[in-house]
Amino acid sequence: MPSGCHSSPPSGLRGDMASLVPLSPYLSPTVLLLVSCDLGFVRADRPPSPVNVTVTHLRANSATVSWDVPEGNIVIGYSISQQRQNGPGQRVIREVNTTTRACALWGLAEDSDYTVQVRSIGLRGESPPGPRVHFRTLKGSDRLPSNSSSPGDITVEGLDGERPLQTGEVVIIVVVLLMWAAVIGLFCRQYDIIKDNDSNNNPKEKGKGPEQSPQGRPVGTRQKKSPSINTIDV
């Protein structure tokens, strides 16, 4: 075959290529549209990121992180990313089937800087990470007041050790105390009545002897009478 000549493809192959040429401009946009729609649905099903992320109850080796979730969203868990700055110590805490809005961070190094990020877990995946929060643990020499809780007393909920009583609790306590006072007062009253009755009955029983008749005979003894016979003459 001469070098300047080129062989042409078969007629059947030319037809197939011609049929694919009109589709090539539309194939890429269609695929991109489907992928973007799929990603849009997935993002719509994910919960929003947590808000109001704060770190409290700082100790030398522990802390408590808490957050809020926007209303109207189904959240079944959380995921916390903990990172120590200027050193190793990355940790991820993940928990599902819970509605808690706080978590205790333990095993921290004293006098060290950390950052945390919280994600919400929904039915279709995790939310984007929340705002990055920085905190620093206390030194070992920084002691807490004697009336405060120890580091081991930190709860998952992050509640304070001393909580003021609510109005309903105070009312219940007062009602219970009044009921007990009424029961004790009623018992004391009944006891006094029984004691007075016993003291009044004892002197009468001691001074009471067998009753006697005016003739000196006991009243209880009946005199023997002779039978009387009545005769009627007709």
Curated annotation (Swiss-Prot):
Residues 1-44 form the signal peptide. Pfam families: fn3. CDD domains: FN3 (cd00063). Residues 45-167 are extracellular. Gene3D superfamilies: Immunoglobulins (2.60.40.10). One of its GO terms (biological process) is response to transforming growth factor beta. Residues 122-160, 197-234 are annotated as: Disordered. This is Fibronectin type III domain-containing protein 4. The chain crosses the membrane at residues 168-188. Residues 189-234 are cytoplasmic. It comes from Homo sapiens (Human). The gene is FNDC4. GO terms for cellular component: endoplasmic reticulum; extracellular space; plasma membrane. Induction: Up-regulated by inflammation in the intestine. Up-regulated by TGFB1 in a colorectal adenocarcinoma cell line. Highly expressed in the liver and the brain, including in the cortex, hypothalamus and hippocampus. Also expressed in adipose tissue. Residues 197-209 have a biased composition (Basic and acidic residues). Residues 47-140 form the Fibronectin type-III domain. Glycans are attached at N52, N97, N147. Keywords: Glycoprotein, Membrane, Secreted, Signal, Transmembrane, Transmembrane helix.
